[in-house]
């Protein structure tokens, strides 16, 4: 049973990490800035993983754009998602740039042999310090329009889309990396606003995966959405009809601590409805979970999970050197870099 996505300590693959990645519970890995020095190094690292680990691994990253962009040197500096609507006055131009950003991000990541970037962010508004300019907009209609184009750009390249952070992280001030946030708004308001982007994109068949928030919505349930069967099974699966994969957000984050120790967090998230669990920046916890976590599931559930996982691997890959000579890449690189520079100047 492959469930966990774990991380690496540095820029070279270590023997003990190969052994961890080959564990039956491990489905893939997520890369961070500490794993990246330059293009040649990251290509070598990923090639080492593919060659030395004797099973297919889903290799992932957070390459959203703006401040959440793990790899920078030698790659397009993607603009923050808020910049499209904030700096561009023409709605058609806003949508075109969102499409270009989705295409460019997916093209560069798949050229590096990465399967999936956890994008786009579908949270409404910019007041939450953990979200901020990662959000497209504060209005659901505008957010949906821009997210549609971003995803269509990703899909053109063959990368699956992951909507996050369900049912919406945008209206809490606390940062779930540091603590468990609470959203005290009425259930009716959350369903009328925050859930609408997820609902619309699921209905259009544009979301391949969803990542829930480590947020407790006090008027709906007493557990974080990432460990809540109400949010994941009743709302996401049954009410919204979502059939794709559900990733937990990083269970190493402080916001997940409400669910207990690391084994308890994995157990609760899996039982609540997550298919794949991220556990990052906690190497001792990874060893602990691999030793002690004993999921009890039917064979049918395991087959469904594996099917969902298999659909997330990249559908195609352009050679890195070839990509950088393509007219689309060159044009996107120029326009997106300029927009990000304008955004940084705008924010001062």
Curated annotation (Swiss-Prot):
<dbReference type="InterPro" id="IPR050226">
    <property type="entry name" value="NagZ_Beta-hexosaminidase"/>
</dbReference>
<feature type="active site" description="Proton donor/acceptor">
    <location>
        <position position="177"/>
    </location>
</feature>
<dbReference type="Pfam" id="PF00933">
    <property type="entry name" value="Glyco_hydro_3"/>
</dbReference>
<keyword id="KW-0133">Cell shape</keyword>
<comment type="pathway">
    <text>Cell wall biogenesis; peptidoglycan recycling.</text>
</comment>
<feature type="binding site">
    <location>
        <position position="134"/>
    </location>
    <ligand>
        <name>substrate</name>
    </ligand>
</feature>
<feature type="binding site">
    <location>
        <begin position="164"/>
        <end position="165"/>
    </location>
    <ligand>
        <name>substrate</name>
    </ligand>
</feature>
<dbReference type="GO" id="GO:0008360">
    <property type="term" value="P:regulation of cell shape"/>
</dbReference>
<comment type="similarity">
    <text>Belongs to the glycosyl hydrolase 3 family. NagZ subfamily.</text>
</comment>
<keyword id="KW-0573">Peptidoglycan synthesis</keyword>
<protein>
    <recommendedName>
        <fullName>Beta-hexosaminidase</fullName>
        <ecNumber>3.2.1.52</ecNumber>
    </recommendedName>
</protein>
<dbReference type="GO" id="GO:0004563">
    <property type="term" value="F:beta-N-acetylhexosaminidase activity"/>
</dbReference>
<keyword id="KW-0963">Cytoplasm</keyword>
<keyword id="KW-0326">Glycosidase</keyword>
<dbReference type="GO" id="GO:0005737">
    <property type="term" value="C:cytoplasm"/>
</dbReference>
<feature type="binding site">
    <location>
        <position position="62"/>
    </location>
    <ligand>
        <name>substrate</name>
    </ligand>
</feature>
<dbReference type="GO" id="GO:0005975">
    <property type="term" value="P:carbohydrate metabolic process"/>
</dbReference>
<dbReference type="GO" id="GO:0009252">
    <property type="term" value="P:peptidoglycan biosynthetic process"/>
</dbReference>
<comment type="function">
    <text>Plays a role in peptidoglycan recycling by cleaving the terminal beta-1,4-linked N-acetylglucosamine (GlcNAc) from peptide-linked peptidoglycan fragments, giving rise to free GlcNAc, anhydro-N-acetylmuramic acid and anhydro-N-acetylmuramic acid-linked peptides.</text>
</comment>
<feature type="active site" description="Nucleophile">
    <location>
        <position position="249"/>
    </location>
</feature>
<keyword id="KW-0961">Cell wall biogenesis/degradation</keyword>
<dbReference type="InterPro" id="IPR001764">
    <property type="entry name" value="Glyco_hydro_3_N"/>
</dbReference>
<keyword id="KW-0378">Hydrolase</keyword>
<keyword id="KW-0131">Cell cycle</keyword>
<dbReference type="GO" id="GO:0071555">
    <property type="term" value="P:cell wall organization"/>
</dbReference>
<feature type="site" description="Important for catalytic activity">
    <location>
        <position position="175"/>
    </location>
</feature>
<feature type="binding site">
    <location>
        <position position="70"/>
    </location>
    <ligand>
        <name>substrate</name>
    </ligand>
</feature>
<dbReference type="GO" id="GO:0009254">
    <property type="term" value="P:peptidoglycan turnover"/>
</dbReference>
<dbReference type="GO" id="GO:0051301">
    <property type="term" value="P:cell division"/>
</dbReference>
<keyword id="KW-0132">Cell division</keyword>
<dbReference type="InterPro" id="IPR022956">
    <property type="entry name" value="Beta_hexosaminidase_bac"/>
</dbReference>
<dbReference type="InterPro" id="IPR036962">
    <property type="entry name" value="Glyco_hydro_3_N_sf"/>
</dbReference>
<dbReference type="InterPro" id="IPR017853">
    <property type="entry name" value="Glycoside_hydrolase_SF"/>
</dbReference>
